[in-house]
Amino acid sequence: PPNVYKNLIKSKEKYNFFFKQKINRMDYSMGLFVYYFGSKKQYKNVAHHTIYFGKSYKEHLDKIFEKKILSDDISYYLHRPSATDSSMAPDGQDAFYVLVPVPNNLSNINWSTEGEKFKDLVLNKMDESVLPGIKNNVINDFYLTPNYFEKDLSTLHGSGFSIQPKFSQSAYFRFHNKSEVIKNLYFVGAGTHPGAGMPGVLSSAKVLDKFFNELLFNKKTC
């Protein structure tokens, strides 16, 4: 919804004062650095899902949301699909992606120059912790930065999860599934009710499925 209301709808005469204040004062979620890679080495002891916390976790969050700079002591989520589906990688090899919270594009970080350096940092951190030896075993890798989220996925400021889920932007205060100001405009996704993440996004689709079922067929659903 934020990108639609701010950039895609050209005529904004239906926006009242309070709605304009709402869309202009929103706080946005972190950005994401997502690194996909294969490995010539298999890591059988690594689970499907792993969360690794850096030593200065609170400082990392402060750099993301307040200072809007990159941290050299990162926390990350590591996904190993081949742990439960062996077809995700050739025999004796492995497949991963690692997701690292970073500042969104309000930071003005130049990812064209910082991307490779940050990838090397991520590799070093994994090599020192969960995936020893990974630096010498990476194959077929690529990464996504907040620029991808902003340019390809049209998320405002390259945020990974749309608006922040703080109290003043949650529940009724979140963008509604049925637009408050534009007739026949409806939303599903991370920025609308009930919230971000796969469960929230799918739930937003279920909300509209129920709504349209009642609207089109004039019947109540359970």
For the regions a protein language model found, what residue spans apply to each?
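Mid-domain catalytic core of redox enzymes
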Residues: P1-A89
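Conserved FAD/dinucleotide-binding core of flavoprotein oxidoreductases
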Residues: P2-N7, G38-K40, P90-K125
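Hydrophobic, well-ordered secondary-structure elements that form the walls
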Residues: F37, V98, M126, L185, ...
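Flavin-binding catalytic cores
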Residues: Q42, I69-S71, W111-K151
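A glycine-rich dinucleotide-binding beta-alpha-beta segment and adjacent secondary-structure elements
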Residues: D73-Y77, P132-P194
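Short glycine/proline-enriched loop/turn "hinge" motifs that connect secondary-structure elements
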Residues: S86-Q93, H176-V181
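A conserved FAD-binding loop/helix module that cradles the flavin
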Residues: A190-F212
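Active-site-proximal substrate-binding core of FAD-dependent oxidoreductases
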Residues: N213-C222
